[in-house]
C-alpha cells in the first residue's frame, strides 16, 4: 500500500510521517520505518492449551489428551503423552442459561499415569484467578507495578505473577501419580454467586456448598398479583424494567510443570452435584472419571476457524484453541544480523520496530507468523495457538551507538492498526480507539549511568492504534553499547499483535504520541 497523499499534511523531520484527517473525528498517522520480524523462534516445550469453548454452558470434556480406547466419545481424546517440561494454560468462562441460573461450574484437570512406575509431577510454578479476584478496572496507560498489585483482568494478573516467579501458596510443590492411576491436579469452582467456601481448590471433594438464599418472587398481574387500580378502574402501567443480566464469571490458570514419566492430561467442566435439600457438592475424582469416560465435548462449541490456505473473502475466523501447542517461550538477542553481536541504533529521528505475537493475516507486513503450531487439536478449533497466550518473550537489545556523539534512545511498546499492505511502515490512530487491545506487565532491565542494574515492572493498557509513550529513555555514549532486556508473558486478555520500537530522540520526535489522556508516570530513564 502506498502512503495516502490526498489531504495529507507532512510532519517536519525525518523520516516521512503523514497525518491524515478522517472525517474530522480522528487522525490517521502513517510513519515510514523498518518493521522487522523477530529473530529466533519458539522453543519445543509442549503446552496443554485449553481455551475452547471459552464460554461453557454445557458440561463435558474441554480438552483430553487421553488415549481414545474404551471412551464413549473417542473423538474427544487426542492421545498425546507429556513427559519432561511442559506448560498448562486454561481459560474458560461460566455463564448462566438465564438470569436465575446460579449453578456452580467446576473446572478440573486430571492426570493419568499409564506406566508401571510412579510418576512425580513437579509444579514449578502455578497461578489461577477468577474474574472477581482480578476485575477489569480502569488503569492509566502505564503504571509502575512494584509489588505486582497492578492488574486488570485475570489474564493480566496471571501473566504478571508468572513473570515475577510467583506461585500461590495453596499449590503443592509436586504430586505423585501411582502406576495405572489417575490423580486430580486441580478441582476449582467458577461460581455464579458468592460462595462462603474457599475458591482456590482446597475445599475437599464431596463437601457441601450451601444453597443460595431464597430470593423473593414477584408475580405479574397475569399470575394473580393484586395491583392498585386507578380512578377509572384500570391498573396503572408499570414502566418497563431493564433486562436482567446473565451471570458470568471466568477463570484463568497457568502452570509450569515437569513430569518424571509419560502422563496424559484432561481438563473437564461439570456442575456441582445437587443434594435433596438443594445444596451443592464439590465433585469427586470419581465424578470426573465418569465424565471423562462417558462424556462428550463441552459446549456450546466455538465458531470453527478459517483455513488460511483456502480463505478467499468474508470475515476471517481465527477460532479458539483446544489442543497441544508446540512452544512455551521465545528467547532471542536482537542484533543487526546473525554475524553481529550488537543492534545498531537508528539515525536521529528514525526508528525501527520488531513484531510481537504476530498472527495469520496480521504481521505488519513482515510475513512472520509467531503463533505456536498445534501438535494435536480438535477439528473445530484453532489451527494455531493464535496470540501465544501465556508464551514468555525474553528479548535482549544490545543497543550500539555508532555515532561520534551521545544519542538519546527511547523504547516503546505499541499497538498499531493492522495493515498487511503497508510496506516498511506502521499506521496509528489519534486518538486511539476506545477498545483495549493489551493489558499486561512488561519487565525492563538496564543499567543506569552509574552502572547499577535497574529492574522495573510496568503494567500497560493500550488501545487499538495507540502510539504510546516510551517505556524507557537512555543516553548512549558515542561508540558504546547498552543492553536492555525486555520480558513479558503474553496475557490472555490481549489482542495481538504489538510491536517493540527503538526510536532515536536526538532529533525532533515526530513519532510522539498525542493522547488526550495524561501519562500516569514519568518515562523511565537511566537515572530513574
Question: What spans do the regions from the language model cover?
Answer:
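Low-complexity, serine/threonine/proline-enriched polar segments
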Residues: 144-168, 173-175, 445
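Non-catalytic, interaction-prone regions of core transcription and DNA-replication machinery
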Residues: 27-79
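Internal, well-ordered alpha/beta segment that forms a basic, Gly-enriched binding/recognition surface
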Residues: 178
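Well-ordered mid-protein domain cores that form the structural environment of catalytic cofactors
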Residues: 121, 128-156
Amino acid at each position: 500500500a502506498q502512503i495516502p497523499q490526498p489531504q495529507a499534511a507532512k510532519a517536519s523531520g525525518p523520516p516521512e510521517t503523514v497525518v491524515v484527517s478522517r472525517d474530522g473525528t480522528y487522525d490517521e498517522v502513517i510513519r515510514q520505518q523498518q518493521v522487522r520480524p523477530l529473530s529466533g523462534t519458539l522453543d519445543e516445550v509442549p503446552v496443554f492449551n485449553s481455551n475452547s469453548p471459552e464460554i461453557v454452558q454445557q458440561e463435558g470434556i474441554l480438552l483430553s489428551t487421553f488415549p481414545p480406547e474404551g471412551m464413549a466419545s473417542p473423538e474427544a481424546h487426542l492421545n498425546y503423552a507429556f513427559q519432561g517440561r511442559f506448560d498448562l494454560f486454561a481459560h474458560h468462562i461460566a455463564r448462566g442459561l438465564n438470569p436465575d441460573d446460579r449453578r456452580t461450574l467446576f473446572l478440573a484437570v486430571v492426570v493419568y499415569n499409564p506406566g508401571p512406575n510412579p510418576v512425580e509431577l513437579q509444579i514449578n510454578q502455578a497461578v489461577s484467578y477468577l474474574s472477581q479476584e482480578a476485575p477489569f478496572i480502569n488503569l492509566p496507560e502505564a503504571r509502575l507495578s512494584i509489588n505486582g498489585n497492578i492488574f486488570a483482568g485475570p489474564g493480566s494478573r496471571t501473566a504478571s505473577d508468572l513473570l515475577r516467579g510467583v506461585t500461590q501458596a495453596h499449590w503443592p510443590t509436586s504430586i505423585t501419580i501411582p502406576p495405572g492411576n489417575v490423580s486430580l491436579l486441580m478441582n476449582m469452582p467458577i461460581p455464579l454467586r458468592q460462595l462462603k467456601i474457599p475458591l482456590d481448590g482446597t475445599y475437599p471433594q464431596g463437601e457441601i456448598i450451601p444453597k443460595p438464599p431464597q430470593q423473593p418472587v414477584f408475580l405479574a398481574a397475569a399470575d394473580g398479583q393484586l395491583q392498585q387500580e386507578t380512578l377509572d378502574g384500570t391498573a396503572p402501567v408499570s414502566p418497563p424494567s431493564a433486562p436482567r443480566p446473565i451471570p458470568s464469571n471466568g477463570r484463568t490458570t497457568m502452570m509450569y510443570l515437569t513430569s518424571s514419566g509419560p502422563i496424559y492430561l484432561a481438563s473437564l467442566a461439570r456442575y456441582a452435584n445437587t443434594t435433596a435439600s438443594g445444596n451443592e457438592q464439590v465433585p469427586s475424582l470419581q465424578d470426573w472419571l465418569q465424565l471423562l469416560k462417558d462424556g462428550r465435548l463441552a459446549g456450546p462449541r466455538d465458531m470453527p476457524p478459517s483455513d488460511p490456505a483456502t480463505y478467499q473473502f468474508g470475515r476471517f475466523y481465527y477460532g479458539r484453541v483446544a489442543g497441544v501447542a508446540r512452544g512455551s517461550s521465545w528467547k532471542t538477542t536482537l542484533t543487526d544480523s546473525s554475524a553481529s553481536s550488537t543492534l545498531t541504533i537508528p539515525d536521529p529521528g528514525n526508528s525501527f520496530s520488531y513484531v510481537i505475537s504476530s498472527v495469520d493475516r496480521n504481521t505488519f507486513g513482515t510475513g512472520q507468523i509467531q503463533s505456536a503450531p498445534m501438535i494435536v487439536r480438535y477439528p473445530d478449533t484453532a489451527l494455531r495457538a493464535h496470540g501465544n497466550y501465556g508464551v514468555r518473550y525474553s528479548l535482549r537489545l544490545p543497543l550500539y551507538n555508532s555515532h561520534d556523539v551521545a544519542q538519546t534512545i527511547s523504547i516503546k511498546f505499541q499497538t498499531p492498526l493492522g495493515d498487511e499492505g503497508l510496506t516498511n511502515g506502521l499506521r496509528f490512530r489519534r486518538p486511539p480507539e476506545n477498545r483495549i487491545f493489551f493489558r499486561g506487565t512488561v519487565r525492563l532491565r538496564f543499567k543506569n549511568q552509574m552502572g547499577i542494574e535497574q529492574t522495573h515492572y510496568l503494567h500497560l493498557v493500550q488501545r487499538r492504534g495507540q502510539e504510546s509513550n516510551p517505556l524507557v529513555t537512555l543516553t548512549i555514549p558515542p561508540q558504546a553499547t547498552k543492553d536492555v532486556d525486555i520480558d513479558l508473558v503474553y496475557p490472555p486478555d490481549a489482542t495481538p499483535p504489538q510491536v517493540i520500537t527503538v526510536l532515536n530522540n536526538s532529533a525532533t520526535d515526530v513519532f510522539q504520541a498525542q493522547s488526550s489522556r495524561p501519562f500516569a508516570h514519568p518515562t523511565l530513564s537511566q537515572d530513574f
